[in-house]
Amino acid sequence: MDSVPRLTGVFTLLLSGLWHLGSSATNYNCDDPLASLLSPMAFSSSSDLTGTHSPAQLNRRVGTGGWSPADSNAQQWLQMDLGNRVEITAVATQGRYGSSDWVTSYSLMFSDTGRNWKQYKQEDSIWTFAGNMNADSVMHHKLLHSVRARFVRFVPLEWNPSGKIGMRVEVYGCSYKSDVADFDGRSSLLYRFNQKLMSTLKDVISLKFKSMQGDGVLFHGEGQRGDHITLELQKGRLALHLNLDDSKPRLSSSPPSVTLGSLLDDQQWHSVLIERVGKQVNFSVDKHTQHFRTKGEADALDIDYELSFGGIPVPGKPGTFLKKNFHGCIENLYYNGVNIIDLAKRRKHQIYTGNVTFSCSEPQIVPITFVNSSSSYLLLPGTPQIDGLSVSFQFRTWNKDGLLLSTELSEGSGTLLLSLEGGTVRLVIQKMTERTAEILTGSSLNDGLWHSVSINARRDRITLSLDNDAASPAQDTTRVQIYSGNSYYFGGCPDNLTDSQCLNPIKAFQGCMRLIFIDNQPKDLISVQQGSLGNFSDLHIDLCSIKDRCLPNYCEHGGFCSQSWTTFYCNCSNTGYTGATCHNSLYEQSCEVYRHQGNTAGFFYIDSDGSGPLGPLQVYCNITEDKIWTSVQHNNTELTHVRGANPEKPYTMALDYGGSMEQLEAMIDSSEHCEQEVAYHCRRSRLLNTPDGTPFTWWIGRSNEKHPYWGGAPPGVQQCECGLDESCLDVRHFCNCDADKDEWTNDTGFLSFKDHLPVTQIVITDTNRSNSEAAWRIGPLRCYGDRHFWNAVSFYTEASYLHFPTFHAEFSADISFFFKTTALSGVFLENLGIKDFIRLEISSPSEITFAIDVGNGPVELIVHSPSLLNDNQWHYIRAERNLKETSLQVDSLPRMTRETSEEGHFRLQLNSQLFVGGTSSRQKGFLGCIRSLHLNGQKLDLEERAKVTSGVRPGCPGHCSTYGSICHNGGKCVEKYSGYFCDCTNSPYEGPFCKKEVSAVFEAGTSVTYMFQEPYPVTKNISLSSSAIYADAAPSKENIAFSFVTAQAPSLLLYINSSQDYLAVLLCKNGSLQVRYQLSKEETQVFNIDAENFANRRMHHLKINREGRELAIQVDHQLRLSYNFSSEVEFRAIRSLTLGKVREHLGLDSEIAKANTLGFVGCLSSVQYNQVAPLKAALRHATIAPVTVQGTLMESSCGSMVDVDVNTVTTVHSSSDPFGKTDEREPLTNAVRSDSAVIGGVIAVVIFIIFSIIGIMTRFLYQHKQSHRTNQMKEKEYPENLDSSFRNDIDLQNTVSECKREYFI
């Protein structure tokens, strides 16, 4: 099967090569001088210094020694008539002999008729040729693309500033022969087959055409079964319709298979090549090629009877055609090697011609181009004082706005303005400040197509017709009679116009015009060029230089391209990309990068190749563990039961991950480790082993290969996990399921060989026997680690560098990396071409320089940093170049941007190796570290290359110096070889950045006591990481911080005591906050903060800081109290710290004892005392920490408890597997089963639960009613905004313990 596309590709390549060889200009003998044999009459020019045509051939010295114009300006040109169309391959120039007159740069133009010129382009831009540096040397240029033309025009652009324009020229090439047919738009040419049916598996059709019409059929063929092929012009573009053996779509209703080309109605020659092998098609128009696969079921194209060219005749109706015919010329028309036009010229019997001639008739139409949006205009005279007005012309443009026509009407009729505004034609007649008439017509007229406009006025009625729509013209009437004006200004107004002859309320027109008629008389625009008619400024006459800047579409990743006359724009909406050309991904390349930015677990889009061709993929990033897991869900992660499968009718299930295989492969290849859990539950269903070695169940991986090993086993071993550790149910087999038991068992494990992942399909064949059943589950694809984000290299000599293959980035280039250094300067990377280059360097301690040259001269961007960049900290650089702009960004400094010129060279052509950390000259090398280097989304493996390079070391230590601040709340940044992690041991918080609060709900009797007494025997067996659980029992200062939520007052929140001293934090009866200090036998110090009622069910944050005599209390991030003790004070021999109710209440202060009576009902969060986190120790290290918990302590988020009953606990699934997971020994099913035992059991459990709830509620309501009278007075003291559940909590403090137990059930 693989040989078919390979042969197809070879055949297509061969055909394409032969076509290009036959049509190219690189004929070995096509370099003859063509101008040296011409007579002087073959030369013409815009003007001549002597008034006569001087010999302008190369190396001629007679006469004036060459050509010089009367005036040296940008409007001059030298032209030659070569007599016939020839193949032109090269040109050469000299200056005028014996003078200081020579041209230093020029452009070329070509024409078949001496009219409607075409500029020579290279790289899609008007090409500028380098001229001479003196009068005698010859400057020779071989054309990259040959040209076929009869007329050649040299247009000087720059010349010797100390002299004038002077030229002697030569043109090289050879004769050119072709077969041409002219179609008048009402005829066609038929090629009849020798048999009824022509069936082909391969087709090659080639031709050239030129036309002034935007629509028309070039050729068509069809078969009775629905096959058809049609090539037609549609609005200046070529549409190819192609269907194979598909009777449903017809030409009249089906959209084209592909559309290519633009502005093809310019009366210039265009090349077409169609190559087909089976369903694979290459469609080329000029230099643009599109590959596609055609519709239909068969590989052969079946055409009945004939092919028609120029139109689609209706059978039995001579002169009638199905669609609009082609109007223009076709040249060298070949169908599968048959020269159709040659057959027609020789009147062969296969060819039937209509009114077709065999020479190309050229309409003598002169277009003009308005180049400048501020200074271009054309002035043509009219016939003044004629009763009425008549003006018509055609225009084409990409701009939405521009002046088309302005004229001052005679007899005081006012001023007529015709403009294009928002793509709509607007006609206004204005007299003084009064608008006497206004007409709006058309829409989207800035589509680049030719549109005709006709204005006719008689007396007080004016008519505006668009695109020859005489049936429904737009009309208006005026209050005055209209008389033709004296001067008509097209496109704009002169700068020096001082009167009201020309008005332009908007910018000048940029575009092309032709066929201008005034008072029903055509205007000779060549006379305008010669200066004998009218006037003009900034026009190209006899040339329409419109360009489609959206062909090809340089908007990447599916961005929509729109354009004006001078530039193009990209709409990146809904692409997942941004930037001037939709080059930059909106998303990061991995979950590791999201984690580095401080994100927590959740669904994210990742773009593994950045700005590369692969799109973003949605994944789940689990950023709650030390390893950052990336999970990709597929369409069937539930346990699925299978019955009735056998080798003849196997069960198969394909898995869809919501992305392409290329996206998944890129993610897997970038990860350090990937895995998928696979589970096979079985009852009399064998898994792998069979007598002949063929497995009963297998899975398909990324390369569409069959894999017979199961989870927990390595590739190539037909075993399960139990087979490796010899723990299978039957030692004769290597999987539990292969024991073939009549009871449920399973084989479960992880597949972790990255080259085989992900699992794309599972096949099961052994569930068709009696009592045979299987249930399988394949978990999501899970990966961790980013192999490239921390991929770093250290350069420690200036002469060292890494080299990589050439950076290919013709149209778009983006480079990003991190660096750190202490050096003053150095080159990060460099890549060279013949003329082009790209370089990034640190040019000074505070400057980054990005330099690039695409052939138009170097462009240099420099970003100045207000702080030093050689501070041995990591800094980020992103440099980008595209067809719209060049940019450089350093860290979070403002991005520096410079627009790219729309003309000139635009391809970045590099050919040397890419040097990283230095240059090819081994000078200005970089000293320091470079990390995570990406070029156009490709990740360079710096570490691997550094292993085999001298002067360079893989890796770079010292991440915490830059990223340590990302660890919050006392967390400590710890270095790793690849990155860092946050050690939250000394923090009351946890999580990857020590930002996740550790909090718990307290009931009235809950008590958490942390003991400071030493020694602790358990300390001998704990790890060093837990050392912070224990602390100094005699601190000289207190740093206390915690958050709380409660509705109960009074309450005791925290109590720290020694044998003589204590510190207590409590809420008074009125809800005020009180801090009580008893230190060093001083009197008890009481600090009250009564700014509000803190028992208001809102989260409050408290900080108490004492150092020596100074005490500061901060509540809700505001300093509420400062105090200086009279002498140095300190806690001595601290015994314990208690959260909630103090159980040993002997010796308690009376106020503390009152608050302690009710305990604490609410939530405490992130409790810290110096280096101790008692609440975290109770919840995370209860077995090793000196902490005692009495009563019920439920972990919960205090933030979630605001306005929620603190006694209501909601269970959530672990975020480690967001998709859920079942791991029961007996499989659960997601199918509907009719098992009556199961249904009965469920009903019984439900009934039991209902009766239990009724009994509990009845008893609770009875006891609550008995205590209601007693608590009625208490309830009046509570704040009105307290929730009833909190009031109930407080009320129940005086009830019996049995009642409390029932309430919390």
From Swiss-Prot:
Disulfide bonds join 30-174, 329-360, 512-544, 550-561, 555-570, 572-582, 929-956, 960-973, 967-982, 984-994, 1163-1198. Residues 25-1236 are extracellular. Residues 180-360, 367-544, 791-956, 1000-1198 form the Laminin G-like domain. The chain crosses the membrane at residues 1237-1257. InterPro entries: ConA-like_dom_sf (IPR013320), EGF-like_dom (IPR000742), FA58C (IPR000421), Fibrinogen-like_C (IPR036056), Fibrinogen_a/b/g_C_dom (IPR002181), Galactose-bd-like_sf (IPR008979), Laminin_G (IPR001791), Neurexin-related_CASP (IPR050372). It is found in: Membrane. SMART domains: EGF (SM00181), FA58C (SM00231), LamG (SM00282). Pfam families: EGF, F5_F8_type_C, Laminin_G_2. Residues 584-790 form the Fibrinogen C-terminal domain. Keywords: Disulfide bond, EGF-like domain, Glycoprotein, Membrane, Repeat, Signal, Transmembrane, Transmembrane helix. GO terms for cellular component: membrane. The keyword Repeat applies. Residues 30-174 form the F5/8 type C domain. It is a single-pass type I membrane protein. Residues 1-24 form the signal peptide. Glycans are attached at residues 282, 355, 496, 622. Residues 546-583, 957-995 form the EGF-like domain. Residues 1258-1305 are cytoplasmic. SUPFAM superfamilies: Concanavalin A-like lectins/glucanases (SSF49899), EGF/Laminin (SSF57196), Fibrinogen C-terminal domain-like (SSF56496), Galactose-binding domain-like (SSF49785). Belongs to the neurexin family. May play a role in the correct development and proper functioning of the peripheral and central nervous system and be involved in cell adhesion and intercellular communication. This is Contactin-associated protein-like 5. It comes from Canis lupus familiaris. The lineage of its organism: Eukaryota, Metazoa, Chordata, Craniata, Vertebrata. The gene is CNTNAP5.
